[in-house]
Amino acid sequence: MALNIADLAEHAIDAVPDRVALISGGDQLTYGQLEEKANRFAHYLIDQGVKKDDKVGLYCRNRIEIVIAMLGIVKAGAILVNVNFRYVEGELKYLFENSDMVALVHERRYSDRVANVLPETPDIKTILVVEDGSDDDYERFGGVEFYSALEKSSPERDFGPRSEDDIYLLYTGGTTGFPKGVMWRHEDIYRVLFGGTDFATGEPIEDEYGLAKQAAANPPMVRYPIPPMIHGATQSATWMALFAGGTVLLTPEFNPDEVWQAIHDHKVNLLFFTGDAMARPLLDSLLAAKDAGKEYDLSSLFLLASTAALFSTSLKEKFLELLPNRVITDSIGSSETGFGGTSIVAKGQSHTGGPRVTIDKNTVVLDDDGNEVKPGSGVRGVIAKRGHIPLGYYKDEKKTAETFKTINGVRYAIPGDYAEVEADGSVTMLGRGSVSINSGGEKIYPEEVEAALKGHPDVFDALVVGVPDPRFGQHVAAVVHPREGTRPTLAELDAHVRTEIAGYKVPRSLWLVDEIKRSPAGKPDYRWAKDVTEERPADEVHANHVAANAK
């Protein structure tokens, strides 16, 4: 049994060739059409000299061509590299060089950036350009239009041998440092991120053809992953759909009004998003439509799934009020662990802080001595994943040794997320240790404070960082994007958050901003938030705290 991603996709293609696989705008592809175009793309790469394990970059928003390329890359035995479409030249140069990229697929709108970087990245010899309505010149650097390249290549499925040991590279977002390439075996990432484990039982799906057989026996589910394909969660939703004969809806931009309209138009069954950064605009859009008397037919929608980012309790409650009888899930995971745990959101949940989830059997919380934290002990530990985990970071032995550790004979992935184990065995996420705040010896995790802040009616979005404090070393600083027409004060926020978190965690200074900077997938940019606090004085500082940069 070879649990290779290309093989798994081909099993579904053979089972349901006439079924719609992809929808984007007014375009759609059946599984058979996807197969033909992906084969052509794979052969084009091979004809251009791309070899097994060579790296091919995908610098595109969500659209049909990116999935054709993803499938074609694994068919050719190459390795895809997800490129953040917000990266500017310096970041692109780093990623292109770090990944040893030899080929690139990009949307035409990014041609100027690509042109500026290519002279410094001479290993990139093959460039395909996806038309997107822009008119940037790509012929100056030898770019070839995507579909014209495919026309010249073979549509046949005649490729070399594949293995479950082939490498799948998943680059991290780089919001707390340089992006790192996480190296997964195909079988391992299939098991923990791409649907190779039964969701209900937690047991591996043993039959290589199992998902394809289910596809042939059942009508398709329509999945709509909103985050960009650079995000592991969207790659997960896409591959899971393709292995199971489902339909994937793709939209290049996040527009909350258009999301609800797309669900109405395409009878979407499963919606995927990343925490508050997408949930809050979606909720506001749905409320505005309701007030305006606009009705969407959302009867097909039965699952709303948030992954990999803070999803505040207050927003969950409001979604349940507007969309009763739906399943709403909140999951944890990372590029280094895959999914680690999920909770089904229920009415009346009273806990604060980060997500509270039921972890899977291969996820544990370890204390400082490497022992599993006992439920209800109050001990804080780190999330650790065993079993199907990555090989390490690409070209970074030092960071690999720091993150992937063998403890008591068991190898774990430990990316640095802290958590507490509740008395019932569920786990409350506290946040990444690298962005924690040390105030007077107390360790404070931003997500818990951010969740409390975002429960205030005047707060649209917020990030929390530590700033220098002459007495405590650091204190908690809030960078807040207010709702339109409001200006929350530090005293108002103080009074609100004290009802949810301990006093030492309460923000002592406040910066108001027009927008919170996040990655395209909604991940917080703490470096940006730190820069805000360093570049200008605070709008308010608590009377008992004197910050060096206060007004």
From Swiss-Prot:
Signal sequence interval, chain numbering: none
InterPro entries named among the record's database cross-references: AMP-bd_C, AMP-bd_C_sf, AMP-binding_CS, AMP-dep_synth/lig_dom, ANL_N_sf, ATP-dep_AMP-bd_enzyme
Pathway in which the depicted protein is active: Lipid metabolism; fatty acid biosynthesis; Steroid metabolism; cholesterol metabolism
GO biological process, one term: cholesterol metabolic process
Any single Pfam family the record assigns to this protein: AMP-binding_C
Molecular function per GO: acid-thiol ligase activity; ATP binding
Residues annotated as binding ATP: 172-180, 417, 432, 523
EC identifiers of the protein: 6.2.1.2, 6.2.1.3, 6.2.1.42
Deleted gene: phenotype: Not required for growth on rich medium, nor with cholesterol as a sole energy source. Cannot use beta-sitosterol as a sole carbon and energy source, it can use 1,4-BNC (3-oxo-23,24-bisnorchola-1,4-dien-22-oic acid) an early intermediate of beta-sitosterol degradation.
Reaction catalysed by this enzyme: a medium-chain fatty acid + ATP + CoA = a medium-chain fatty acyl-CoA + AMP + diphosphate; a long-chain fatty acid + ATP + CoA = a long-chain fatty acyl-CoA + AMP + diphosphate; (25S)-3-oxocholest-4-en-26-oate + ATP + CoA = (25S)-3-oxocholest-4-en-26-oyl-CoA + AMP + diphosphate
PANTHER family linked to this entry: LONG-CHAIN-FATTY-ACID--COA LIGASE (PTHR43767), NONRIBOSOMAL PEPTIDE SYNTHASE PES1 (EUROFUNG)-RELATED (PTHR43767:SF1)
Purpose of the protein: Not essential for degradation of straight chain sterols such as cholesterol. Catalyzes the activation of medium/long-chain fatty acids as acyl-coenzyme A (acyl-CoA), which are then transferred to the multifunctional polyketide synthase (PKS) type III for further chain extension.
Entry protein name: Medium/long-chain-fatty-acid--CoA/3-oxocholest-4-en-26-oate--CoA ligase
Gene: fadD19
